Amino acid sequence: MLAYASFAPVMTERSVTPPQQGREMFKKILVANRGEIAMRIIRACRELNIATAAIYSEADSTGIYVKKADEAYVVGPGPVKGFLDGRQIVDLACRIGADAIHPGYGFLSENAEFAERCQAAGITFIGPSPAAITLMGNKVKARELAESVGVPIVPGTKGGVIEAGAALAFAKKAGYPVIIKASAGGGGRGLRVVRSDAELRENMDVASREAQGAFGDGSVFLEKYIERPHHIEFQILADRHGRIIHLGERDCSIQRRHQKLIEIAPSLILTPKLRKEMGEAAITIARAVKYDNAGTVEFLLDPEGRFYFIEMNPRLQVEHTVTEQITAIDIVRNQIVIAAGKPLDIEQEDVTLQGHAIQCRINAEDPKNNFLPCTGTVTAYLSPGGIGVRIDGAVYKDYTVPPYYDALLAKLTVRGRSWEEAVSRMRRSLEEYVLRGVKTTIPFMKTIMQDQDFLAGRFDTSYLETHPDLFTYDEFEQPEDLVVAISAAIAAYEGL
C-alpha cells in the first residue's frame, strides 16, 4: 500500500476556537478536491476558524490551494486515482485528526459508498446522506420520485432501457426527437439526441457502452427531447432540523455539449408566479428525499412556459457563486454549518434576489476547435477587479495547466444592479483579464457579451448552435495585453 508523503504540515497562528453557539464546530476539515473549489472551501473554513488539510497529486504539488491549506498531503498513485481512492482519503483523515471531509464537486462528491465510509469511520461527510445520494444519482428513480410527489417530468421510459425494441416503441409513441440518457449520468455526460429510427438503433449500444465506461452502469433511458428550452436550476439549502429553503434560480442555458459555460442569476424570463411554483417544486423534491445540505434541483423550461424536473445534483455546484452574489448568502459556509448539526438561521422570507449576476467559466479550451482542452504554461496573468467583480481560481503566472483534470481555470463572476450593468461589468472585466500561454474561453466570452441576442436575453440551450458567428472572433492580442505580457516577461528575466 502506498505510504503518504506529507507536504510539511504548517499550522498557522490563527485561533481554531470553534464558534460558541450550538454544538461544537469542526476543528479540522480535510478538503478532498483540488484547484479553485479547494480554495473556495479553505476560505470558508478560515472564516469559521476551522483548520484545513488539503490533498494533492504530484501534478498539483505547486498548486495555490496546497500552500494555502494548513496542512497538505500527497495522494496517489497517479494524478487522478488518489482523488478517487475513498479508502485512502478516509484513512488519511483519521490519521491526521480531521473530523469532517468536504468533497467539493466532481471526484467523490456524489459517491454514496464514500459517504458511507466516512460515516463508518466517525468522519462527517459534508453533503447529503448516502441514501439521498443514491436515490438522486439514479436518474430513473429520481424521475419516479418527482412524478410521485406531483412534480412534472419530461415524458420518458419508466425504467432503464437496454433493448432497442423498447426504445423504438417509446420513440414511436412520443415522436422524435428523443434523447438517450445514462441512468447514472450527470454533468452533461451520457447524453445523445436522436431524430430517427436509424439514429436510435445506431446510438443505443454506443450510449450504453459509454455509460458503462463512465459510470459503471450501462443502463440508459429515453425522454422526449424538448427543443430550445431554458435550463433552470434552483439552489436548495436544507438542515437536519426540517428546514428547507431555496435561494432562487440560475439560468444555465448557454452550454456546449450539454455542459455549462455561462450562468446567470436570476433568470431573465421567470415571472414571480413561475419562480414561486418552481421553487416550491424544488423544495417538494428535496423534502421527499429527506435531503439535507446544499443541492440543486434542475428543470427544463419549454418555450410555452411549462417546466419539467430533470435531475437533482446532490452536491455543491460550480456555479454557486452567482447565487451567492445576488443573495449575499455563503453557500459553502452553510454546508459546513449544516453538516455540524446546526439549524439554518435563514427563513425563506429572508431570501431576496438583489440585482443580476453572471458567471463565465474561464476554461483552458479552444472554442474554435470544438472546445478542445489545451495545456501549457501560463506566461502572463492579470485578473480583473473593481466593484462587483469576483474571481474564484487557482491559476497564476508560470502555472502549468495539466492534462489530467477538468479544463476549468477560474470562474469570473460579476454582479450589477441591473442586467445591463452586469453585462457591461462582465464585458469590462473580460477586457481586463490577461491570461497568456494557453488558449482560453476569454475571447469567446467577450464576443458573447457583445451579441445583441444575448444582451436582449434571447437565448436558450440552442444558443451556440444557432449563433455560429460567435466563433469568428479575433484571437489577436490587444496592444495593452501585449504590454502586460512583455512587462511580465522582463520582470521574470530580471528577477523582479
Report the location of each language-model feature:
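A composition/secondary-structure signal for short, hydrophobic, low-basic-content segments
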Residues: V16-T17, T134
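Catalytic cores of soluble metabolic enzymes centered on carboxylation/carboxyl-transfer
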Residues: A282, T321-T323, T327-L496
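Short, flexible, solvent-exposed loop/turn segments with mixed acidic/basic and small polar residues
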Residues: E13, A182, T400-Y404
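Cationic, low-complexity basic patches in intrinsically disordered or flexible, solvent-exposed regions
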Residues: R14, Q21
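Short hydrophobic alpha-helical segments enriched in small aliphatic residues
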Residues: A5-A8
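N-terminal beta-alpha lobe that positions the nucleotide/phosphoryl donor
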Residues: G22-V297, L301-N313, Q317
